[in-house]
């Protein structure tokens, strides 16, 4: 069973105490939708720019934050994407890419993210002549170093870009095939959605599917549900990035529900791009309550100014999602990952045990020395069912 029918205060009329942010930070988590070039540290951008003699719109932290618009409401996806013009300036060398990938995984580890899938478009990092293979290997090296240092497992999703060309996307798909089994676990199509339909990139997706590689597509973020239908039926996507406008097509929504197609929800980012008016009107809770497989992700840690812990906390406090359902969403993240099945099963078992240490109100049921409290006989809802069903 995918989720529990927990009542919140909006339903039963009783005020439920909010779970503290520190609890969300302590929980084991995934981040399945995070862009490398939108998730740098401001300090790193300044240091790399100075070392590489790269011009920036500002030379201090606050000025750079304002220039990128970290955490701002941009009003459209196109405006939101302008910040990448700044970050990409310092992402054109092997050393920079290795460092940035390592630091992203390090930041994720600090909030107890156990597994993440880092996505980026290698062709955007060749502005100074860096070979595509060197781009891919530098990022993989950084993520590998983070795993050796912290134990966090971070894999790669290679992206094509809607608004560049179908030929470029095919080249990125070839890279994904070349690095299959070497750290690359999937292929994606990102970029401006309106006027750049996924069907134009069908050949790239045919190539990755012919080579048994997982794929996800940004769809239903800045365009209607027909974009989602095209991603699923024309390109064969296994997951949908964002999917905010899926709610406009009930029949399609039922199809995704029936086929257990996961949604990579990125709530704060969706507000900032204008995909939704505010968090209260985000469809995430609707999707979950209808039984769809919902995961919670960052999108861009820097540009959105967020973390997985923050997103989960906002889903709980601003959308009224009960803590018991938050735990189900966390497990859905592990279940929806592009890990091999046996690794997914093992992760679900471990994480399920950890989540079961908390009751439905975020109260830790076991003491620090590992002994059970007298309340620990009450098992939190949903974990056992989700762990047992890793498909």
Briefly describe each language-model feature range.
Residues 2-213, 222-227, 234-239, 245-262, ...:
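Metal-cofactor-binding active-site regions of metalloenzymes
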